[in-house]
Design a protein with these regions (language model features):
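Aromatic-lined ligand-binding clefts that engage carbohydrates, nucleic acids, or primary amines
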Residues: 3-28, 57-59, 506-508, 518
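N-terminal catalytic cores of secreted or lumenal carbohydrate-active enzymes
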Residues: 14, 24-233, 242, 425
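Histidine-centered catalytic/metal-binding microenvironments
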Residues: 83-140, 144-150, 421-525, 529-532, ...
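Catalytic grooves of carbohydrate-active enzymes
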Residues: 145, 149-151, 303-498, 665, ...
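Alpha-helical scaffold elements lining the catalytic groove of polysaccharide deacetylases
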Residues: 223-244, 311-331, 636, 640, ...
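CE4/NodB-like, metal-dependent polysaccharide N-deacetylase domain
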Residues: 231-265, 272, 326-340
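Catalytic domains of cell-wall/extracellular-matrix polysaccharide-remodeling enzymes
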Residues: 246-292, 350-359
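C-terminal (or distal) subdomains of carbohydrate-active enzymes
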Residues: 266-271, 285, 292-295, 310, ...
Length: 905
């Protein structure tokens, strides 16, 4: 008889699935396709079907590689013809469901009626016609979340973006009320260069107020693994580019719906680039503790603050029941009536569809559905902002209680990131030096390749192999270019005439103190004819201790003929003492340790205080069972320990007086590890070098430091500053932070009179702690989405640094810079000179760049006390927000500031 009266309604086949690929064939014709991201359809049945004709349907589903696939649901929806007032009551069942979900009631005498009878249908229709429309409303606009890479390579992203953008523009022509929002300046830049005609259409739609660029950083970046300098560049590049391309909009948004957590310092960085609003959805993924707010003021350690919005789900359709549930959830948390809805296929692009817009139009006339209106994100935020002083304040990081393995997966990406960032900062500093000396410094460093690779599925290591294979030449090319640019600029700097120096050492960071100890080609080395302390290196060349330096500086080096000599006494030279059979004590007056073939047995500070309660432990565990394999560390990994086999081999490589270097070996299942311990003269930390041939899968390798003195607090650097946490968790949220990302250091802080142990890192790592230990995750072995993610050779460095007092007064953040970036040598001449003055140990340099009036210096006061900086004779300083210069200024605790350094002459 047909599905319904052909003149009163028609039907849609409604499907939802979980599949790598979905294809729907009707009578041999492909009518719909989907995947893991486009997971539902509402296909309209053809006219002949409504007349009773049969359809030959074939549904093709392909399971994902990492999971079982499924056809989740399949049913028919009946709808009135477009423009029809639904005289047959086709929508009554769905309308009644909406009415009840909005706390409505059933018709009077419902219990006495037959639910399937005509009388019941008439009673429902009358009851719903008389009922009030649900309280509340929704602002809606189309959206298409698009990951720059993930389960597809970057080249596919450009194609997906083009399809999405063309589709959105075509829909705008058919649906005059449609507004569409999209993010990512890097995408718009590609479109402008490679699809100029399409970009011109986007610009026209933007000027008409229908295309809304919801940009923020250059890409939707990772926000817990990148340094402060990179995060600053992300926002600065993104905001500047957005203002240039779309001047008709104000650009005050940080649109980051899908990044894996947000560092406590992000408000300071974003606010400094003009951002006022932060928007995300990701905290809805919290596994243990639902995030309590939907709109709030996020306050950093300093005085910075962002208005913050927890977005509705991304990638949704226009189901009126889902929209009602979102509005009710919003109202319950915020007390506000008007909510936001951003429908559109996401992750791999797509955006809104005709089906979606038809569904919105269908329910606009129904009194049981929420009132909706098309608008923009900025209109919604402006409305919210009227009552922002009543919002709750959040004074913490926005920790994602999921994806705790991202800091450890794919360490090669983290290594590339830290190396390229260092080279870019050095190139920028060299440009500032040229500007100070009156040389040409007009060219700027290209940060865009680095910023692109910091996307939240590339840097964390959570993409398919092709993404990383294609990223490798990008990393290498960008590193080579930054290296060449840095050296080219340094070569232009003035140097004394007639200098005999043929090498030079550069320390471009303005640290309080440098004690350079470098390995140079074999020979006898001197500075300005003054011989230097030297030691022949076991692996070739000569260890040379340079004079102490301060600030940004350079040291000319002269290589003479002959062998290295120890005639010059070293500062805090290394002394090795054999304590017994196979046990040695090594020290330099600042730190000492005991070692045997069993490993690091003991560690002491300069006063002889023990730092370890037992030997350093190398631990290996099974890491299996989480759905998001590359993302998530198994919650129960400590319940599944695996073995580590010592080889009883200890081999000395260097034995002082400048460097003591020894090597141990360990067997880790099918993998092997070489652990080097190295202590340098006049250095307050012990360096550990882990060289690992990793062949394990679904395992985690960790270092564990048992502390001799209980910790009460843990400090660690984070994007935009420093965060401190209790050593023992108290609240449920603190218990959920059992593994966290750290960028370059973390430190235990003991009770009064203080002191503790700092672990200095060569790049981001996952770490954990308690009051009696510190732990570092070295390697994992996930197999999805990259089957060989962490396999192969890895070299990772870290250092153990005991300290007295607080980590801030001990200069731990600057020590981490000195460990990670110990300066560099180049076969070119230079002057013996301090180019820029030194910062106090309590201040951490972030970046140095050329400025019209001098040198732009960004820095952080990471500690808990105010710090005064007096650059010294010949220098003045001012804030970028103030035109008056001064000989000194005070930096408040937690402040991230931009200063202009000028020569007083």
């Amino acid at each position: 008889d047909g599905l319904c009266d052909a003149h009163s309604c028609f039907a849609r086949l409604v499907l939802s699935w979980w599949a790598e690929q979905m294809r729907l064939w009707v009578d041999g014709v492909l009518v719909n396709e989907g995947d893991l991201f486009d997971t539902a359809c509402r296909w309209p049945l053809p006219e002949r079907c409504r007349q009773g004709a049969a359809l030959d349907l074939v549904l093709e589903l392909c399971s994902p590689l990492h999971d079982d696939g499924a056809l989740i649901s399949s049913h028919l929806d009946l709808e009135p013809q477009p423009g029809d007032l639904d005289p047959e009551g086709t929508l009554l069942p769905a309308a009644l469901e909406l009415h009840l979900a909005a706390d409505g009631d059933l018709p009077p005498r419902w219990a006495a009626l037959d639910p399937s009878g005509v009388e019941a249908q008439a009673a429902v229709a009358t009851h719903l016609h008389q009922a009030a429309q649900p309280a509340g409303s929704l602002n809606w606009l189309g959206h298409a979340h698009l990951d720059l890479a993930w389960l597809w390579p970057v080249a596919d992203t450009w194609q997906a973006a083009e399809r999405t953008f063309r589709s959105a523009l075509a829909l705008m022509r058919r649906w005059p009320e449609l507004r569409f929002a999209h993010s990512t300046p890097a995408l718009y830049a590609w479109m402008e260069q490679h699809r100029p005609a399409l970009f011109a259409e986007i610009k026209a739609a933007s000027r008409a107020g229908r295309w809304e660029p919801v940009n923020g950083p250059w890409v939707e970046t990772d926000c817990v693994l990148v340094s402060t300098a990179s995060l600053w560049k992300q926002f600065a590049f993104g905001q500047d580019d957005s203002r240039r391309r779309f001047p008709e909009w104000s650009h005050e948004l940080a649109w980051l719906p899908d990044s894996f957590g947000f560092a406590a310092g992000l408000p300071a960085v974003a606010a400094a680039t003009g951002v006022r609003w932060f928007c995300t959805h990701k905290l809805a993924w919290n596994a243990e503790n639902p995030f309590p707010h939907r709109v709030f003021r996020w306050r950093g350690r300093g005085r910075s603050e962002l208005r913050s919005l927890m977005l509705p789900p991304i990638g949704r359709r226009a189901d009126p029941l889902e929209m009602l549930e979102e509005q009710r959830a919003w109202h319950q948390v915020t007390g506000l009536e008007n909510a936001l809805w951003i429908p559109g296929v996401g992750d791999h692009g797509g955006g809104p569809t005709d089906e979606l817009l038809e569904q919105i139009a269908l329910w606009e006339e129904q009194t049981t559905a929420l009132p909706t209106r098309a608008g923009t994100v900025r209109e919604f935020l402006t409305e919210l902002e009227q009552d922002d002083q009543a919002w709750p304040v959040w004074r913490d990081e926005l920790f994602l209680e999921l994806h705790r393995g991202c800091a450890t997966s794919r360490p090669d990406q983290k290594r590339h990131n830290r190396t390229l960032e260092r080279l870019l900062r050095e190139a920028d500093t060299a440009s500032a030096l040229l500007a100070f000396t009156g040389r040409d410094s007009s060219s700027s460093s290209d940060w865009r390749p680095l910023l692109f690779q910091q996307f939240h599925d590339i840097l964390p290591g959570t993409s398919i192999p092709e993404v990383f294979e294609q990223a490798e030449p990008v990393w290498c090319s960008a590193r080579r270019q930054a290296h060449q640019e840095r050296d080219r600029r340094l070569a232009k700097l003035p140097r004394p005439k007639g200098t005999a120096a043929d090498w030079s050492w550069w320390g471009l960071q303005p640290l309080a103190s440098w004690s350079p100890l470098v390995r140079l080609p074999a020979g006898s080395w001197s500075v300005d004819a003054a011989p230097l302390a030297q030691q022949a290196a076991a692996v070739g060349g000569t260890w040379v201790q340079l004079p102490r330096q301060h600030g940004s500086c350079s040291v000319p080096l002269r290589r003479g003929s002959g062998l290295a000599s120890c005639a010059v006494e070293a500062r805090h030279s290394v002394v090795i003492t054999q304590l017994g059979s196979g046990v040695w004590r090594v020290g330099n007056g600042l730190i000492d340790f005991d070692v045997s073939a069993a490993g690091l047995l003991a560690l002491r500070d300069r006063d002889g205080c023990e730092q370890l309660s037992s030997p350093l432990k190398l631990e290996r565990y099974r890491d299996r069972g989480e759905f998001w394999d590359a993302w998530d560390l198994a919650t129960d990994y400590r319940s599944h320990p695996l073995g580590v086999v010592s080889t009883d081999e200890l081999r000395w490589l260097d034995q002082g007086p400048l460097v003591a270097h020894l090597m141990l070996r360990r067997q880790l299942g099918a993998s092997c590890m070489r652990l080097d311990l190295r202590l340098k003269a006049d250095t307050p930390w012990l360096e550990l070098i882990c060289s690992i041939d990793w062949r394990q899968t679904h395992e985690v390798l960790r270092l564990n430091l048992p502390l001799a003195t209980p910790a009460v607090r843990i400090g660690a650097d984070t994007s935009g500053g420093v965060i401190e946490r209790p050593a023992e968790p108290i609240t449920a949220r603190e218990h959920a932070r059992w593994e966290v990302p750290v960028i370059s250091w973390f430190a235990s802080q003991s009770a009064a009179p203080g002191g503790g142990m700092a672990v200095l890192l060569d790049g981001p790592q996952g770490v954990d702690w308690s009051s009696d230990r510190l732990g570092v995750s070295l390697l994992r072995g996930p197999t999805w989405p990259d089957p060989s993610a962490d396999q192969g050779w890895h070299r990772q460095r870290l250092a153990l640094m005991p300290f007295a007092g607080s980590w801030s007064d001990a200069g731990v953040p600057q020590a981490a810079i000195g460990f990670r970036e110990p300066g560099f040598c180049a076969p070119q001449a230079a002057a013996l000179r301090q180019w820029f003055p030194a910062l106090p140990p309590q201040l951490t340099p972030v970046a140095m760049e050329r400025h019209d009036d001098g040198c732009l210096l960004r820095l952080i006061n990471a500690g808990a006390a105010r710090c005064r900086w007096t650059p010294g004779a010949g220098w003045c300083v001012r804030r970028t927000t103030d035109s008056s210069v001064t000989e000194s200024l005070v930096i408040a605790p937690g402040d991230l500031v931009a200063l202009v350094l000028v020569q007083s002459s």
